[in-house]
């Protein structure tokens, strides 16, 4: 069924009794050309582009829980492409361009809202760094504007300009950045992949990877053995655990990243604002709630919840940027498991094990990269060679010394 204003109207008049399920609930087949482990945004996007762009439809997406129960539904919904380094900039700009046409592409309302992302700066050195970043963006054809104090104050008068410990000097603005409804992204890709013949198999946990003569031939699951010609791992924070089933150790640590939403408030934040003197970012949802987050919890964990020390740290940073937040009540919080790589950049590559491919190490950048990640991973699986914008995301770059360290923090995953 194709969604349209007319179909919504007609089904509403009929009591919404004639809607077809958005995707099937198939039983697994004995063998697939490609099995994708992980039914999150990246896994579903990979399946969608494999079918749509490369004509490979004998594909299964295996999800141990329900579709969208992982990180794709546990983030703060921000999209942007304001990256500095050559390895990152073209890739995230590809993702931004795919976001811009996504709803028309898969005929699903993902609520893409390009309302701008503003990164505040608070010192001369930070201003110079943002100027450099903005110039690099513009050289790659990405929009960027450097705003000074008066322009920022006119745009966001509720920020603390008069009594701030770290005075606001200005900000770097990307107007094409914004937010997207994260659940709708998972549902849209799932619906699009399923309509092209992909099997989305929920409540099917991978418990082992079967190898024969040094190559992967399938996976052991809670629903039995399923064979495959190629196995693609897109398991986010659980990537290390799944790869270990094949005897592969990854340069990745898993950390919890918490996110929060407040009570509904009168609209006052038009776009996304990030605090340059602390790790804090905030936007306002359609319901009026403030959606915000900050640093990861600094210890390794696979729990989808965090600790109170980080909650306090995030609240302090938010209050320093917007003093009025001190009176706002938090409704709920949640956590996602971040696959933190050694240099803060992702891995999209084949592994040393034949027929085993990896999509992992996304750190904070996973959600905003969803379309490009799926497209580039599908290209790798279909063609056997990396897509040009993802060519730098090799697994062996740590051994070769070709790191993509956007923040310049060195080989310490919990700092990226």
Curated annotation (Swiss-Prot):
Location relative to the cell: Cytoplasm
EC number: 1.5.3.24
Domain of life: Bacteria
Swiss-Prot/TrEMBL GO biological process terms: tetrahydrofolate metabolic process
Catalytic activity: sarcosine + (6S)-5,6,7,8-tetrahydrofolate + O2 = (6R)-5,10-methylene-5,6,7,8-tetrahydrofolate + glycine + H2O2; sarcosine + O2 + H2O = formaldehyde + glycine + H2O2
Assembly and interaction partners: Heterotetramer composed of subunits alpha (SoxA), beta (SoxB), gamma (SoxG) and delta (SoxD).
Identification of the protein by name: Sarcosine oxidase subunit beta
Species, as recorded: Rhizobium meliloti (strain 1021) (Ensifer meliloti)
Upper taxonomic lineage: Bacteria, Pseudomonadati, Pseudomonadota, Alphaproteobacteria, Hyphomicrobiales
Gene: soxB
């Amino acid at each position: 069924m194709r969604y349209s204003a007319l179909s919504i109207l007609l089904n509403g008049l009929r009591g919404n009794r004639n809607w077809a399920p958005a995707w099937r609930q198939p039983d697994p087949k004995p063998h697939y050309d490609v099995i994708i482990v992980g039914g999150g945004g990246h896994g579903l996007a990979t399946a969608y582009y494999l079918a749509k762009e490369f004509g490979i439809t004998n594909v299964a997406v295996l999800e141990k829980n329900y579709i969208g129960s992982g990180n794709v539904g546990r983030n703060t919904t921000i999209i942007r492409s304001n990256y500095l380094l050559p390895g990152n900039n073209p890739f995230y700009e590809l993702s931004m361009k795919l976001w811009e046409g996504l709803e028309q592409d898969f005929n699903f309302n993902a609520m893409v809202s390009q309302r701008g992302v503003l990164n505040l700066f608070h010192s001369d050195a930070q201003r110079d760094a943002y100027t450099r970043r903005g110039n690099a963006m513009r050289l790659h054809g990405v929009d960027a504007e450097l705003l000074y104090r008066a322009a920022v104050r006119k745009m966001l008068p509720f920020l603390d300009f008069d009594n701030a410990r770290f005075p606001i000097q200005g900000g770097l603005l990307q107007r094409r950045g914004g937010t997207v409804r994260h659940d709708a992204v998972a549902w849209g890709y799932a619906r699009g992949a399923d309509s092209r013949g992909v099997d989305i198999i929920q409540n099917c946990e991978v418990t082992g990877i079967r190898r024969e003569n040094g190559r992967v031939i399938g996976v052991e699951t809670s629903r039995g053995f399923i064979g495959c010609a190629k196995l693609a791992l897109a398991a986010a924070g659980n990537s290390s655990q799944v790869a270990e089933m094949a005897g592969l150790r990854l340069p990745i640590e898993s950390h919890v990243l918490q996110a929060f939403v407040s009570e509904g408030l009168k609209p006052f934040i038009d776009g996304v604002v990030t605090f340059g003197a602390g790790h804090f970012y905030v936007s306002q949802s359609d319901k009026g709630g403030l959606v915000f987050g900050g640093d990861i919890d600094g210890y390794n964990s696979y729990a989808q919840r965090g600790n109170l020390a980080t909650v306090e740290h995030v609240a302090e940073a938010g209050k320093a940027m917007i003093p009025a937040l001190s009176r706002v009540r938090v409704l709920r919080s949640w956590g996602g498991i971040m696959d933190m790589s050694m240099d803060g950049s992702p891995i999209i590559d084949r592994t040393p094990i034949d027929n085993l491919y990896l999509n992992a190490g996304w750190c904070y950048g996973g959600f905003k990269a969803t379309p490009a990640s799926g497209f580039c991973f599908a290209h790798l699986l279909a063609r056997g060679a990396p897509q040009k914008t993802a060519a730098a995301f090799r697994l062996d770059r740590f051994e070769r010394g070709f790191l993509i360290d956007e923040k310049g923090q060195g080989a310490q995953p919990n700092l990226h």
